Amino acid sequence: MPSRVDRFVAIEALGALTHPAEQTAERFREALEAAARPRRPLRVFQSLDEAIALRMQVNHLSEPVARLLVERGVDAFEDGFVWSSDQRLTQPTAFRLTEPQALDLIRGIACPTRVILADPPQSYFPDAMRRHRVTQLQSAGLHIVDGTHHLHMEDPDTIGPLVAEFLERAAN
């Protein structure tokens, strides 16, 4: 219920991932084909350190950040560990909003908003797109912080006060 939200903080995201309307049939086809493929067997890591090393390599993360993600994201399994997330989350979605639809939803955010984004930007959220989206908010402050998609974990001493100060203003 939007009327119950006093303030909104968006960290490294603002709105949905979008796709051009004219590519809807192609995206739908890809999603159906992916859903029809047999599921791969779970990858078993012999140790947490093996999973941490992979997360560091694939996502360009520091060891402490990768460790946090891995410790939260694996389950013990037979002689090792497996990712606890649903494999279907890695498959393409059949439908995405178009950019105009996403912008309309962003324009509907009525409360004061603080947007905290990483520099450099992620490939799926280029700088021009994210800056344009911020301009669609009714009341927004933008903060760019050196880091990656997990900047809140990489630099909590910077992100924490940015969030706390913004939320405390609502309480006063």
What are these regions (language model features)?
Residues R4-D6, A140:
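Core-facing hydrophobic residues within beta-strands of well-ordered domains
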Residues G108-T148:
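Conserved loop-alpha-helix segment in the C-terminal half of the alpha/beta-hydrolase fold
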Residues L162-A170:
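C-terminal alpha-helix
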Residues F45-P121:
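Alpha/beta-hydrolase
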